[in-house]
UniProtKB/Swiss-Prot annotation:
Swiss-Prot/TrEMBL keywords: Cytoplasm, Methyltransferase, S-adenosyl-L-methionine, Transferase
GO cellular component: cytoplasm
Entry EC no(s): 2.1.1.-
Molecular functions per Gene Ontology: protein-lysine N-methyltransferase activity
Entry coiled-coil feature ranges: none
One GO biological process term: methylation
Function noted in UniProt: Methylates ribosomal protein L11.
Major site of localization recorded for this protein: cytoplasm
Gene3D superfamilies: Vaccinia Virus protein VP39
Name the UniProt record assigns to this protein: Ribosomal protein L11 methyltransferase
Species of origin: Shouchella clausii (strain KSM-K16)
Annotated family: Belongs to the methyltransferase superfamily. PrmA family.
Catalyzed reaction equations: L-lysyl-[protein] + 3 S-adenosyl-L-methionine = N(6),N(6),N(6)-trimethyl-L-lysyl-[protein] + 3 S-adenosyl-L-homocysteine + 3 H(+)
Chain sites annotated for binding S-adenosyl-L-methionine: T161, G182, D204, N248
Length: 315
């Protein structure tokens, strides 16, 4: 079968929604070429950069590559990708150039090409993300999360995911009940379990993401503890049921459910939000305060923000 390498030239802000679109429409693998990886202060991320060459990266913006079979429905699939990517603008997401093209590639080439972008990366003091095909020996006390990036929505190395993992690492206590809204790959839910949470619910509206999360949860032998469900944000979630609520999704989506988040978090509990571009920090902080949350901490990495908000104990 013939395969196509489909390329989207976009912005860092749009990387995750663009990647999600590609996965939802059947991409067999997705790779991200971000020149920011060449200059980021990697000591902040704890990890090591592997084989990064400036020649492989665009001069500006981010290149997202996906691999599709060139079958009977290929043209329709590509047309739908273009439509959905351009539609991100209606959600106030800057897609930058937004140019898209594709080239034909041999099956043996694409099958290994995208894997070269993924290696073990230590993203917090305790956590290392390891692709399933890599042999890796954990250090004493190290927490290893295995992911299959070929099907993942968020592979652990995007700044928003790193910020979320760092916040979870500090927030989760032994025996906590944790809810992950917009779970994607399931990485945050898996991490919450490894940090000591007793009951973890992972929610996503998208069926492809739900299946991806379930597979990654199984890879980490966490299926008995992490319950992945299809659902729209916090609809039908019981009040005061989460010690920690975490959500790494776009600011525009977070703004839609701050009141529901306040309802679901227990008194004294925490709401950890990321996926927030710096320019939208004030809007999210304002919405959280408006429903009663207290802002405890704000952390930044590159142009992204994570907010730790607490529901008052006497709420």
């Amino acid at each position: 079968m013939k395969w196509a390498e489909f390329r989207v030239h976009t912005t860092q802000e749009a990387v995750e929604p663009v990647s999600n679109i590609l996965h939802e429409l059947g991409a067999a693998g997705v790779a991200i070429e971000d020149p920011q990886d060449l200059v980021t202060e990697w000591s902040v991320k704890y990890g090591e950069v592997y084989e990064l060459s400036p020649e492989d990266y665009p001069d500006e913006g981010v290149m997202v590559k996906a691999y599709f079979p060139m079958g009977a429905t290929f043209k329709e699939t590509i047309a739908e990708v273009r439509r959905r990517v351009h539609n991100l603008v209606s959600f106030q997401i800057d897609i930058g150039h937004g140019t898209m093209d594709y080239t034909e590639v041999k099956e043996e080439d694409w099958a290994t090409a995208w894997k070269s972008f993924y290696h073990p990366v230590q993203v917090t003091e305790q956590v290392t993300i390891v692709p399933t095909w890599e042999e890796y020996s954990a250090r004493p006390g190290e927490i290893v999360i295995e992911l299959d990036p070929g099907m993942a929505f968020g592979t652990g190395t995007h700044p928003t995911t790193i910020l979320s993992l760092q916040a979870l690492e500090q927030a989760v206590k032994q025996g906590d009940a944790v809810i992950d809204v917009g779970t994607g790959s399931g990485i945050l839910a898996i991490a919450a379990w490894k940090f000591g949470a007793e009951s973890i619910t992972a929610l996503d509206l998208d069926e492809v993401a739900v299946n991806s999360a379930k597979a990654n949860v199984a890879l980490n032998s966490a299926s008995d503890f992490v319950h992945v469900q299809q659902g729209n944000l916090l609809d039908d979630v019981a009040s005061e049921s989460a010690d920690v609520l975490v959500s790494n999704i776009l600011a525009e989506v977070i703004l839609q459910f701050t009141a529901d988040a306040y309802r679901v978090v227990k008194r004294g509990g925490l709401f950890l939000t990321s996926g927030i571009i710096s320019s939208k920090r004030e809007a999210v902080e304002g919405a959280l305060k408006a429903v009663g949350f207290l802002i405890q901490e704000v952390n930044e990495l590159d142009d992204w923000v994570a907010i730790v908000a607490q529901k008052p104990s006497q709420a």
